[in-house]
Amino acid sequence: MSWQTYVDTNLVGTGAVTQAAILGLDGNTWATSAGFAVTPAQGTTLAGAFNNADAIRAGGFDLAGVHYVTLRADDRSIYGKKGAAGVITVKTSKAILVGVYNEKIQPGTAANVVEKLADYLIGQGF
């Protein structure tokens, strides 16, 4: 399966996230949903935050033109919030999954979908 298929089918296609991307550990975009553009600088900042989250814990982070307040940040997952919407990011051994949800979607539902896809990819060696 292609990275784009994972974005279109396993993330956005579930209805649990409205926008999604898969990034490399260097922050470069491998696949993205339409209209969701993570800049290289944003990807690099996000990728680095999995190793040292101090900066994003203090000041939040930006993705695709939206500033998020950091709710959770560890070496596997970074969760952000903007009003009633938010973002779930999960790191695997080779990629970073990004799933954005809107105010109509429960955060736990979005987190479940992104985390489960990450678990699957980790199990496949990714």
Swiss-Prot record:
Localization in the cell: Cytoplasm, Cytoskeleton
Keywords tagged on the record: Actin-binding, Cytoplasm, Cytoskeleton, Methylation
Primary localisation category: cytoplasm
Chain positions of site Actin binding: K116
Classification via Gene3D superfamilies: Dynein light chain 2a, cytoplasmic (3.30.450.30)
Coiled coil: none
CDD domains xref list: PROF
Sample GO molecular function, one term: actin monomer binding
Region ranges (Actin binding): 2-36
In-chain residues carrying the UniProt-annotated modification N6,N6,N6-trimethyllysine: K104
Gene Ontology cellular-component annotations: cell cortex; cytoskeleton
Protein purpose: Binds to actin and affects the structure of the cytoskeleton. At high concentrations, profilin prevents the polymerization of actin, whereas it enhances it at low concentrations. By binding to PIP2, it inhibits the formation of IP3 and DG.
Complex formation: Occurs in many kinds of cells as a complex with monomeric actin in a 1:1 ratio.
Family statement: Belongs to the profilin family.
This protein's name: Profilin-1B
Organism: Acanthamoeba castellanii
